[in-house]
Amino acid sequence: MNCSGCFKEIDYAGYCRKCLKDLFGGKKVEHVLPYNSPYKEDSNLYQERILKLSISGVQAKYSMRLDGSKLILTDRDGQYILKPIPVGQFKNLDQAPANEHLTMQLAGQLFKITVPPNAITYFSDHSPAYLVKRFDVKSDGQESKYPQEDFAQIAQVTEETHGKNYKYDLSYEEIGLLIKRHIPTYAIELEKFFRLVLFNYIFLNGDAHVKNFSAMLTDEGDHILTPAYDLLCTRIHSPGEADMALTLFKDRFSEAFDANGFYTYNDFLEFGMVLGIKETRVVKIIEEFNGKEASIDKLVDASFLRSDIKVIYKSMYRDKMTRMWIRYKK
């Protein structure tokens, strides 16, 4: 059996010791919730605790907290977010929880991207859900929160001012400029941002829009990027989706893009340098994504995706890596 958090092999169903500590402070929490999924349970139980929708408005998020060693739904002092199987017209939606869990684990375990503790959990009716610990809640016993803003708020773009597609109006270059403007330690944070944008491209997260990047204020008074969130291979659910939610550059495409019709090594090299990252550092970060096929395959195989979706996930990643290593020559 594999741990429902990190995929480590264990002798029982549930979470390994490390994941119990990271997720629940060491409390022995069961990986099966004591109630059915929202589709089989009293809708009022869930409706009062819904947070918001994602995956283009088809996935509900619910607030949870730890009561002793049990996870319970709550409408206040939430410590966790629960995302059950979405409903809608997208493909393979029953695989969405496992997809997000795997993609978040890949980011955290293999690509040096900070992610909050997360896991797969199950309802009593065996339906899976994605569980993630909130990173904005302080561990001070008072359930206070770190001040946080997403980059739509920072850029002051809203549906009222920019229309329904406001989340997709900026470019990644413009988010980088906002990081420079609002975060004093921007040199460090820009490298984190660059790594995350590259990860989203390679693992086909086509919904990494401006609201899926945020900054927060630490106890020390420093502004930093939050841990990454909402990472998943959206192409599994929306095959015709664009490679990226936003363009790399503000108002142009590179010569490499014009020649190839898609982003490649040259685009990300140029993008990193446009952000102000030294070329040697950009090259180093890009190179860290190479040669990890065996490690990626191991996590995909250990994940809770359906077997045929595992094959698709690997195929999509390999295709994107093939594109990524195309070098443009003038």
Q: Language-model features: where?
A:
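Mobile late-domain/C-terminal helix-loop "cap" segments
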Residues: 257-303, 307, 311-318
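Conserved ATP-binding subdomain of kinase catalytic cores across diverse folds
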Residues: 41-163
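Short linear loop/turn motifs
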Residues: 121-126, 167, 283-292
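A residue-level signal for conserved active-site and pocket-lining positions in enzyme catalytic cores
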Residues: 64, 107, 151, 207, ...
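Catalytic-core segments of enzymes that bind and process phosphorylated/nucleotide-bearing substrates
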Residues: 150-176, 218-279
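Conserved kinase catalytic-core segment
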Residues: 95-110, 168-239
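ATP-dependent phospho-/nucleotidyl transfer catalytic cores
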Residues: 124, 131-202, 267-270, 274, ...
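Regulatory N- and C-terminal appendages and interdomain linkers associated
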Residues: 1-42, 46-48, 223-225, 294-330
